[in-house]
């Protein structure tokens, strides 16, 4: 069954490639609907106790101007997310809903060590119990695994099971091999694959994983090979999205301060290729898929 679905995606990609030059020449208008930013960091260097270079009012105004109506906020440390969640007047004025995730990183050292540190699991439990001013945490992550074998470790296993037991979404920056290992710990978990494989997993492999794991979704920031001429989707990716319109999300990945001045252009880039999709598919990827993850909050 999975093989058949992958073959169908391949045939659709071939048909789209034939008409690619015509499609680029007749681009549709940019998508104008709401956006859900499913991968946003508000790290310490951005806000720095509200006196940093990008205070809450600044970043929320960037979201408002970009038509972003909801965000998955996850930050190093979690104080950044709680700062945004606590800015209730400003988020209301900007029309932005903050969906808070628990990040595993208290500091930069945790990026490379969280999967061998039992105190991380306790920290996640404590944060979950406390919640935020915007309500309970709705997910865990983003976390990184640069060696997929670490996805099979005890800390990763406990976190995946904790997420599934508490209906939390997981945001993971991992390769395709780690997707299999993480899902083996908790087959019912909802997992967002950050960047849909930043290492550039082939489209065929992405299609296989989507077919294998119905609760897996792909987030598309930094995804190699996603767009081609005119900022439109490359044929294979367009085919995959048309075949799986409910499985993709967009994100800014503001992992470094240099991403904040680019925020509006990043969202404009998404609007460009979303505009080349059928209207219902564009709205699902741009907004509805993210909102559905967190209903009835949105």
Give the ranges of each region predicted by the language model.
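Active-site gating/metal-coordination segments in enzymes
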Residues: 30, 84-169, 217, 224-225
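Hydrophobic faces of well-ordered beta-strands that scaffold small-molecule active sites
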Residues: 36-40, 71-73, 98-103, 140-141, ...
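Mid-to-C-terminal alpha-helical segments outside catalytic/metal-binding sites
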Residues: 6, 11, 27-38, 47-77, ...
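Acidic/histidine-rich helix-loop elements
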Residues: 40-55, 110-119, 228
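Acidic (Asp/Glu)-rich catalytic clusters
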Residues: 60-65, 85-98, 126-136, 164, ...
């Amino acid at each position: 069954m999975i093989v058949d679905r992958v073959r169908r995606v391949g045939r659709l990609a071939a048909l789209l490639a034939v008409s690619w030059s015509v499609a680029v020449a007749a681009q549709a208008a940019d998508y104008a609907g709401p956006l859900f930013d499913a991968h946003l960091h508000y790290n310490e260097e951005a806000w720095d106790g509200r006196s940093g270079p990008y205070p809450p009012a600044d970043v929320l105004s960037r979201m408002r101007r970009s038509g972003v109506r909801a965000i998955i906020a996850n930050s190093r440390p979690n104080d950044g997310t709680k700062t945004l969640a606590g800015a209730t007047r400003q988020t209301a004025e900007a029309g932005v809903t903050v969906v808070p995730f628990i990040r595993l990183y208290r500091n930069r050292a945790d990026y490379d060590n969280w999967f061998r540190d039992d105190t991380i699991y306790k920290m996640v439990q404590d944060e979950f119990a406390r919640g935020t001013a915007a309500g309970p945490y709705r997910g865990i992550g983003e976390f990184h695994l640069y060696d997929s074998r670490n996805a099979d470790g005890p800390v990763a296993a406990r976190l995946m099971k904790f997420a599934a037991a508490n209906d939390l979404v997981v945001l993971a920056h991992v390769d395709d091999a780690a997707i299999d290992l993480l899902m083996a710990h908790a087959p019912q978990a909802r997992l967002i694959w950050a960047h849909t494989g930043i290492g550039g997993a082939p489209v065929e492999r992405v299609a296989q994983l989507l077919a294998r794991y119905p609760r897996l979704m792909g987030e598309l920031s930094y995804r190699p090979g996603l767009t081609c001429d005119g900022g439109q989707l490359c044929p294979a990716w367009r085919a995959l999205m048309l075949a799986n319109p409910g499985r993709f999300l967009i994100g800014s990945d503001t992992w470094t301060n240099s991403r904040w001045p680019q925020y509006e252009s990043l969202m404009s880039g998404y609007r460009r290729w979303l505009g080349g999709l059928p209207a219902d598919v564009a709205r699902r990827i741009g907004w509805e898929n993210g909102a559905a993850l967190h209903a009835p909050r949105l």
